[in-house]
Curated annotation (Swiss-Prot):
InterPro entries for the chain: ClpP, ClpP/crotonase-like_dom_sf, ClpP/TepA, ClpP_His_AS, ClpP_Ser_AS
Annotated Pfam families: CLP_protease (PF00574)
Protein's gene: clpP
GO biological process: protein quality control for misfolded or incompletely synthesized proteins
NCBIfam families xrefs: clpP, PRK00277.1, PRK12553.1
Subcellular location: Cytoplasm
Name of the protein in its database record: ATP-dependent Clp protease proteolytic subunit
Summary of subunit composition and partner proteins: Fourteen ClpP subunits assemble into 2 heptameric rings which stack back to back to give a disk-like structure with a central cavity, resembling the structure of eukaryotic proteasomes.
Domain of life: Bacteria
Name of the top EC class for this enzyme: hydrolase
Physiological role: Cleaves peptides in various proteins in a process that requires ATP hydrolysis. Has a chymotrypsin-like activity. Plays a major role in the degradation of misfolded proteins.
Organism: Rickettsia bellii (strain RML369-C)
Length: 227
């Protein structure tokens, strides 16, 4: 029997995404040091500034990379905030939960910021950021819905996987309720079908705390001085 893990979206797999949109054109930045020049890919350079990107479909390989970055930044400075930028259509539930659990596990606060879209597990990670530090740019889109999956094989095995998907659904509803402040029944009803939201609607629902149009330099300086 072959069965796909529970997914919360209907988007293509990460392999198809990579084939269609090759990631080989990542910019390289040059930094001058006392020992000469040092080259970084742009994401590694931003990691030095404690910025993590969750971009594209969420699957196991991405989850491993994101959790490794979170753990590295905690080891480097457990008192300093981490900034997670999200532009994702969603993906595999268990991969998203691995990232979420690590966000809750580590000591640094994790601020989340939606750029472009935060759909399915992307919206789950967005609302799982530190309370008061969950942001969205003004023209981003947020979407929540219940998990889905495709299975085949013997009827008994299909039933087992269906029950597992229902358990995952219950867990996600409970966690969305925890982070948004919404009643579980309201969350379940809101996630029955694809539910697209503007940043204003996402804020009202409790997924984000603030819509930002410009970088708040004073806020960042105040946070740095408080650390």
């Amino acid at each position: 029997m072959r069965a796909t893990p529970p997914r919360d979206d209907t988007y293509p797999s990460n392999e198809n995404f990579k084939e269609k949109y090759p990631m080989s054109y990542v910019p390289i930045v040059i930094e001058q040091t006392s020992r000469g020049e040092r080259a970084y890919d742009i994401y590694s350079r931003l990691l030095k500034e404690r910025i993590i990107f969750v971009c594209g479909p969420i699957e196991d390989h991405m989850a491993n990379l994101i959790t490794a970055q979170l753990l590295f930044l905690e080891a480097e400075n457990p008192e300093k905030d981490i900034y997670m930028y999200i532009n994702s259509p969603g993906g595999v539930v268990t991969a998203g939960l691995a990232i979420y659990d690590t966000m809750q596990y580590i000591k640094p606060k994790v601020a989340t910021l939606c750029i472009g879209q935060a759909c399915s597990m992307g919206s789950f990670l967005l609302c799982g950021g530190e309370k008061g530090m969950r942001y969205s740019l003004p023209h981003s889109r947020v979407m929540i819905h219940q998990p889905s999956g495709g299975y085949r094989g013997q009827a008994t095995d299909i039933e087992i996987h269906a029950q597992e998907t229902l358990k995952i659904k219950k867990i996600l509803n409970s966690l969305y309720s925890k982070h948004t402040g919404q009643d579980v029944k309201h969350v379940e009803k809101s996630m029955e079908r694809d539910n697209f939201m503007s940043p204003e609607e996402a804020k009202k629902f409790g997924i984000i705390d603030k819509i930002i149009t410009h970088r708040d330099i004073k806020l960042l300086k105040d946070k740095e001085q408080g650390q």
